[in-house]
């Protein structure tokens, strides 16, 4: 919040964009929820990649990706869920903003990026659907056949395409 407040001293909020990847996607959503709670002006746009406003292991994709990729679901599944519940209520909208439609209805224009082999696919799609239903401008891009970390490899054409989509989205929405 302090960094955002510092940015607001030098920039109009409509000139600020926030981007987060993986856990940073959730942090981006949490930031928007927190800014609303603190009555701060919202940024002009946000982009959330491979993480969004819902718990990443909710839905079909977390379970199926664990099976396909021989992923130890216990790291993020039942034990992981219990661990996160010990830290915060998973239905707390400051932890997972998707549980509060009022917060979600006030999101700035949002870009959501994921892939078909991303364990957080369901969370990202659910966030996008919720935003659209609530009347928030939201774009969803899904890349075929790459995993959760595809954006980390700049050699992949999909990574370059996703990066271009992010730049284009911010160019469109930030003044």
What kind of feature is each model-predicted range?
Residues 1-175:
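Alpha/beta-hydrolase superfamily serine-hydrolase fold, recognizing
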């Amino acid at each position: 919040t302090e960094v955002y407040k510092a940015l607001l001293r030098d920039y109009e909020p409509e000139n600020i964009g926030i981007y987060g990847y993986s856990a940073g996607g959730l942090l981006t959503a949490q930031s928007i929820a927190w800014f609303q709670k603190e009555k701060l002006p919202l940024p002009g746009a946000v982009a959330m990649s491979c993480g969004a406003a819902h718990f990443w292991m909710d839905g079909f994709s977390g379970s199926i990706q664990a099976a396909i990729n021989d992923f130890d679901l216990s790291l993020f599944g039942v034990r992981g869920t219990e661990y996160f519940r010990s830290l915060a209520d998973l239905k707390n909208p400051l932890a997972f903003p998707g549980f509060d439609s009022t917060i979600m209805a006030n999101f700035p224009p949002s870009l959501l990026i994921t892939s078909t082999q991303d364990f957080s696919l369901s969370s990202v799609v659910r966030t996008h659907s919720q935003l659209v239903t609530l009347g928030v401008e939201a774009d969803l891009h899904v890349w075929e056949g790459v995993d959760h970390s595809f954006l980390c490899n700049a050699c992949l054409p999909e990574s370059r395409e996703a990066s271009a989509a992010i730049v284009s989205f911010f160019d469109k929405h930030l003044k």
